């Protein structure tokens, strides 16, 4: 109880317990349940299948912490690729949604960057080689395939950074 009171009294006062309104951070995620059917669908095709709608996929809602990070240790992982050794974690699949209110340029900052494949809709996106995107207005689905053996079990975060000029106006979709 004492820890809960200390935590609640820190909300909004300490930087790690403060939500900054000028930052666009994904806070609501959907994680792909680690079912045998989902693992089979991805293994049979490729990891890009996670960016598509598939009848064997069951997505569950997860929320990031106040700091904007989603602990990967709490995200389901599955053996959905060949060549895994005993003890390998395999991969996790998550998605989030952004609403582009005004078209323009912006980039995604994703941590960890190692071992993460990204799709905007069903189009592959490599933050390292093409950091800025020309966004069109409307809802955008961002899907991540995370190689857990490369990325580890630390926190996952996705931030949107728009330049001051010709930048897109984007908000992260929240709610339940």
Task: Name the predicted role of every residue range.
Residues 77-82, 117-133:
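Solvent-exposed beta-strand/loop surfaces of large extracellular or lumenal domains
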Residues 5-80, 145-176:
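Accessory carbohydrate-binding/adhesion or oligomerization-edge regions at the termini
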Residues 112-114, 122-124, 146-148:
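A mature extracytoplasmic/lumenal domain signature
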Residues 99-100, 104-118, 142:
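Aromatic-lined ligand-binding clefts that engage carbohydrates, nucleic acids, or primary amines
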Residues 106-110, 133-148:
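Short, well-structured beta-strand segments within conserved domains
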Residues 86-99:
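Short beta-strands within extracellular/lumenal beta-sheet-rich domains
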């Amino acid at each position: 109880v004492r820890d809960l009171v200390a935590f609640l009294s820190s909300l909004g006062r300490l930087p790690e317990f403060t939500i900054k309104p000028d930052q666009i951070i994904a806070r609501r995620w959907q994680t792909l349940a680690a079912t045998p059917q989902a693992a089979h669908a991805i293994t049979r095709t490729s990891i890009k299948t996670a960016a598509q709608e598939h009848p064997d996929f069951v997505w569950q809602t997860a929320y990031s912490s106040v700091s904007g990070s989603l602990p990967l240790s709490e995200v389901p992982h599955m053996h959905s690729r060949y060549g895994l050794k005993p003890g390998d974690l395999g991969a996790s699949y998550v998605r989030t949604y952004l609403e582009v209110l005004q078209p323009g340029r912006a980039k995604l900052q994703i941590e960890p960057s190692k071992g993460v494949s990204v799709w905007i809709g069903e189009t592959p996106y490599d933050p390292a080689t093409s950091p800025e995107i020309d966004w069109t207005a409307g809802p955008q689905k961002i899907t991540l395939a995370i190689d857990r053996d490369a990325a580890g079990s630390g926190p996952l975060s996705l931030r949107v950074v728009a330049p001051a000029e010709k930048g897109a106006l984007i908000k992260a979709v929240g709610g339940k």
